[in-house]
Amino acid sequence: MRIKNKIKKRIIELIDLAYITARKGDLELAREYIKLAEMYSRKGRVKIPLKYKRMFCRKCYTPLITGVTERRRIRSKILIRTCLICNWQRRYVLSRNKGSNKEN
């Protein structure tokens, strides 16, 4: 297995572990796991997959759990995700699913 694949696998494991740890209530340990995953990503020059990149706050490294550490709002087809720890906001444009109800 290539080294970059091993690094990516470890990054994913750390982010998953951080999410589980945050659910149990230990946010400080969860932040440390995410910081470590970010460090692996930078040192190994490996991109964090988009699915996992969206799982944590980029300002305070807190795992985003809806209702616990994150608030979600939809305003005019824009999803606004707000970290409840540091008030960092990220906006995503909501688009129609590619395969559903296409008009010909």
Curated annotation (Swiss-Prot):
Record note on cofactor: Binds 1 zinc ion per subunit.
Gene3D superfamilies: 6.20.50.20, Immunoglobulin FC, subunit C
GO biological process, any: tRNA 5'-leader removal
Binding site for Zn(2+): C57, C60, C83, C86
InterPro entries: RNP4, Rpr2/Snm1/Rpp21
Entry keywords, A to Z: Cytoplasm, Endonuclease, Hydrolase, Metal-binding, Nuclease, tRNA processing, Zinc
GO molecular function: ribonuclease P activity; zinc ion binding
Location in or out of the cell: Cytoplasm
Listed EC numbers: 3.1.26.5
CC cofactor: Zn(2+)
Enzyme superclass (EC): hydrolase
Protein name in UniProt: Ribonuclease P protein component 4
